[in-house]
């Protein structure tokens, strides 16, 4: 869960501590258009963002005749000021932008995609699921007195009050970063190889934070393997891994933890280039920290249910994060609490039932035979792969 949320938790046990510090081998660039060299033909810039997480890292990969951009920043004045500065920077040696790769669909990673593609005449590369989600999500929240039924079923079923549902909807209707998506794209698939300059980048796919998140990995230099990680691996925060109204039965934490297993196959010396915070080494240490973080959250939720009996997801959220006041933070936190509850159910640590009178789902510690699907009518046994 995000670090500002972690600070609001009231755990019953001591939170796990890192066994050794990560190493940050490169100083970050100044936000707003300055460039920092990471390796030959690999540059790092920071685009400011007017939110609590106040920047996004973008990277530029030199090809023979131009530069490939990784991620975009929010559709916002700060991005509109930064990108022309980057394009004119002497470090680019007069070469133009030639392509854009978006790791995933979230606004800070793809919000400027349409502008960049149109302004510089470049194509967009993404995975199919991320582009599809970009096209469906980059839409205004419906106006009018009636809230979308799926929104009400999911968050109302999680125990969010009618008053807070309205506050969340008002916040979403006022979203300042909504922007038309870039309609056309070129698909990236797991296992693809991108030849960019002297490097061969392998396309890796992660999931959990978003449906088909692209990471790029190059291990040609054993002394400096490189991973462009997006939001799949960040040094000090755990990316939001939520269940959403569009897929209310999802178990995204299983996908997230499976993606950590995939990242563990990479070289120990890998330089991790995340979308936020610093470039770091210590990949395997960080994946283990994240596993321990989620194990801690699982135990905290089960302890809470054992102490208080049945609770809705919203009640669990309020107990773990009592200081959250911003409607969007509460929305994200409810989705992530539901994700933790969903992950605990198949292993028999949590059960649920539907309260017909209140029209909410209540969770309790322990297993129960015959849990019915939250929103579906068919019981689906997950495949073992």
Where are these regions (language model features)?
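C-terminal regulatory/interaction regions
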Residues: 2-24, 300-385
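N-terminal amphipathic/basic leader segments beginning at the initiator methionine
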Residues: 13-42
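Conserved beta-strand hairpin/beta-sheet module of binuclear metal-dependent hydrolase folds
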Residues: 32-92, 96, 215-235
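Active-site HxH/HxHxD metal-binding segment of metal-dependent hydrolases
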Residues: 40, 78-80, 84-195, 223-225, ...
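Metallo-beta-lactamase
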Residues: 67-78, 167, 171-179, 183-186, ...
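Aromatic/hydrophobic pocket-lining residues that form the small-molecule binding cavity
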Residues: 83, 256, 337
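Residue-level signal for the nucleotide or nucleotide-sugar donor/cofactor binding architecture
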Residues: 111, 251, 332
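Short, contiguous alpha-helical
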Residues: 118, 206, 345
């Amino acid at each position: 869960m995000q670090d500002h949320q972690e600070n609001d938790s009231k755990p019953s046990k001591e939170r796990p501590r890192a066994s050794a510090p990560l190493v940050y081998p490169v100083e970050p660039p100044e936000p707003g258009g300055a460039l920092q060299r990471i390796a030959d033909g690999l540059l790092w810039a920071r685009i400011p963002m007017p939110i609590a997480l106040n920047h996004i890292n973008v990277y530029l990969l030199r090809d023979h005749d131009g530069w490939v951009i990784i991620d975009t920043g929010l559709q916002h004045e700060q991005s509109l000021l930064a990108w022309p500065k980057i394009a004119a920077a002497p470090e680019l040696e007069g070469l133009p932008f030639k392509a854009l790769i978006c790791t995933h669909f979230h606004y800070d990673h793809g919000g400027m995609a349409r502008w960049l593609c149109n302004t510089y005449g470049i194509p967009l590369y993404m995975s199919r699921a991320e582009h599809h989600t970009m096209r469906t999500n980059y839409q205004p929240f419906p106006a009018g007195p009636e809230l979308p039924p799926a929104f009400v079923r999911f968050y109302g079923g999680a125990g969010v009050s009618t008053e807070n549902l309205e506050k969340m909807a008002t916040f979403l209707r006022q979203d300042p970063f909504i922007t038309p998506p870039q309609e056309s794209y070129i698909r990236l698939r797991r296992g693809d190889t991108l030849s960019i300059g002297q490097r061969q980048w392998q396309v890796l796919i992660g999931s959990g934070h978003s449906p088909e998140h692209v990471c790029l990995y190059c291990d040609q230099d054993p002394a400096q393997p490189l991973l462009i990680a997006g939001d799949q691996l960040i040094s000090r925060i755990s990316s939001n891994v939520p269940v959403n109204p569009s897929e209310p039965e999802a178990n995204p934490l299983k996908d997230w933890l499976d993606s950590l297993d995939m990242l563990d196959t990479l070289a120990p010396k890998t330089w991790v280039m995340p979308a936020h915070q610093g470039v770091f080494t210590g990949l395997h240490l960080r994946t283990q920290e994240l596993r321990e973080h989620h194990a801690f959250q699982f135990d905290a939720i089960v302890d809470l249910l054992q102490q208080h009996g049945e609770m809705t997801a919203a009640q669990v959220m309020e107990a773990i994060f009592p200081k959250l006041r911003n409607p969007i933070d509460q929305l994200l936190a409810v989705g992530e609490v539901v994700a933790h509850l969903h992950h605990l159910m198949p292993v028999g640590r949590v059960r649920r039932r539907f309260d017909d009178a209140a029209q909410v789902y209540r969770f309790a510690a322990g297993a129960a035979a015959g849990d019915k699907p939250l929103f579906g009518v068919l019981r689906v046994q997950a495949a073992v792969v």
